[in-house]
């Protein structure tokens, strides 16, 4: 789960990470009120969306007067901000963060990620923070400072000092940076984070170290014990189909292809997507109906897939163990009767009660394409998709 910048900063501040003063606003008038309460004469008005690269997309505006603050908020609120990380559809801006724009001398980068290959937390830092860090990481990986954390002991002070010195800081700045690095790690660890990015981490003229921006993501599987974080969820920033799927205990992730997938089991779902790609097609989604899928759940899965207007064909691939092929077949028939399926439907069933499932489909009178193997099913789905486009 992702959170907004201001929410990430509230969490970081609670762990002792220094952040600029700021306040969230949902209207231009609230933005002006926030600026007056914060004081000063220079503010940043930041669009709050679950994506980075806002600066290059015009999502961060610097203001020197209250009128400029009002105009900036009015320009951002209610719009869809398109950045390099949002895709062409963008993300809706329903709130802005008004922050004191303190002058600074240097921009650094600090990040924490779960390195799944190493099975460790990896701390990443760089002297070259700011908007171009992605390009720097891709073209000049040697510019990144990387430290792997041993989970039995956690991030150590000597590792934080090593990072701080490699960032080229003076003695006074090193002390502040070490505190920031250690406290940010505690926030990442204690909140079940999967990603924390502070970009930029700035150094001011008086040697303070501030988190000028922050992005945090959290492990969905741990939210049951992090209710304060779960309550930060903003459904407007996600795919509404994913939220609907979660309500029915379905795992759904929308993609940009044209072949909808309804599969049981995450591994089989990924294999199905791979086979579609291998056959020359593009999957429109990842959808795992899980074990023990009832006819109602399968019908819901169809409604989710068909809500994507890009879908030109649907591939149902079920290997029934805990599940039952006859239940899935009943769900397919139920969906066809309740939802207009106007795209080719390819079905491959195997496992428990497969003969009963095939019989239900055969007697349903549905216009569908059957397959006995995954390779055959993927090939037929791609052929049907291409035929539907012509």
Curated annotation (Swiss-Prot):
SUPFAM superfamilies in the record: Glutathione synthetase ATP-binding domain-like, Succinyl-CoA synthetase domains
Annotated binding of Mg(2+), by residue: 199, 213
Reaction catalysis annotation: (S)-malate + ATP + CoA = (S)-malyl-CoA + ADP + phosphate
Cited Pfam families: ATP-grasp_2, Ligase_CoA
GO biological-process terms attached to the record: succinyl-CoA metabolic process; tricarboxylic acid cycle
Origin superkingdom: Bacteria
Pathway(s) where this gene product acts: One-carbon metabolism; formaldehyde assimilation via serine pathway
Subunit-structure text: Heterotetramer of two alpha and two beta subunits.
Protein's name according to its UniProt entry: Malate--CoA ligase subunit beta
Organism: Methylorubrum extorquens (strain ATCC 14718 / DSM 1338 / JCM 2805 / NCIMB 9133 / AM1)
């Amino acid at each position: 789960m992702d959170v907004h910048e201001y929410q990430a900063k509230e969490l970081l501040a609670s762990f002792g990470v220094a952040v600029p003063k700021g306040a969230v606003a949902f209207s231009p008038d609230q933005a002006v009120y926030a600026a007056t309460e914060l004081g000063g004469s220079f503010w940043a008005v930041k669009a709050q969306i679950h994506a980075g690269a806002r600066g290059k997309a015009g999502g961060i505006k610097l203001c020197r007067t209250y009128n400029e603050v009002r105009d900036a908020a009015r320009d951002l609120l209610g719009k869809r901000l398109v950045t390099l990380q949002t895709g062409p559809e963008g993300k809706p801006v329903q709130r802005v963060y008004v922050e004191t724009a303190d002058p600074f001398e240097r921009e650094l980068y600090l990040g924490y990620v779960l390195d799944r290959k190493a099975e460790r937390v990896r701390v990443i830092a760089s002297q070259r923070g700011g908007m171009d860090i992605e390009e720097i990481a891709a073209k000049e990986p040697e510019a990144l400072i990387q430290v792997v954390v041993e989970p039995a002991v956690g991030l150590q002070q000597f590792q934080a000092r090593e990072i701080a010195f490699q960032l080229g800081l003076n003695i006074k700045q090193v002390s502040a940076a070490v505190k920031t690095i250690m406290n940010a790690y505690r926030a990442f660890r204690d909140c079940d984070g999967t990603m924390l990015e502070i970009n930029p981490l700035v150094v001011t003229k008086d040697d303070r170290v501030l988190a000028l921006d922050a992005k945090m993501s959290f492990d969905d599987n741990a939210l049951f014990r992090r209710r304060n974080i779960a309550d930060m969820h903003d459904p407007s920033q996600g795919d509404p189909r994913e939220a609907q799927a979660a309500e029915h205990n379905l795992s759904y992730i929308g993609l940009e292809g044209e072949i909808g997938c309804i599969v049981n089991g995450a591994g089989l779902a990924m294999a199905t997507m791979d086979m579609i790609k291998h056959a020359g097609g593009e999957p429109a989604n990842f959808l795992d109906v899980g074990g023990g899928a009832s006819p109602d759940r399968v019908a819901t899965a169809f409604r989710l897939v068909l809500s994507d207007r890009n879908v030109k064909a649907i591939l149902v691939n079920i290997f029934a163990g805990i599940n039952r092929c006859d239940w899935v077949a009943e769900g397919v028939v139920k969906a066809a009767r309740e939802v207009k399926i106007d795209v080719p439907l390819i079905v491959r069933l195997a496992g428990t009660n497969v003969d009963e499932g095939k019989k239900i489909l055969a007697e349903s009178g549905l216009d569908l394409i059957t397959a006995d193997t995954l390779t055959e099913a993927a090939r037929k789905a791609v052929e049907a998709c291409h035929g539907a486009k012509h």
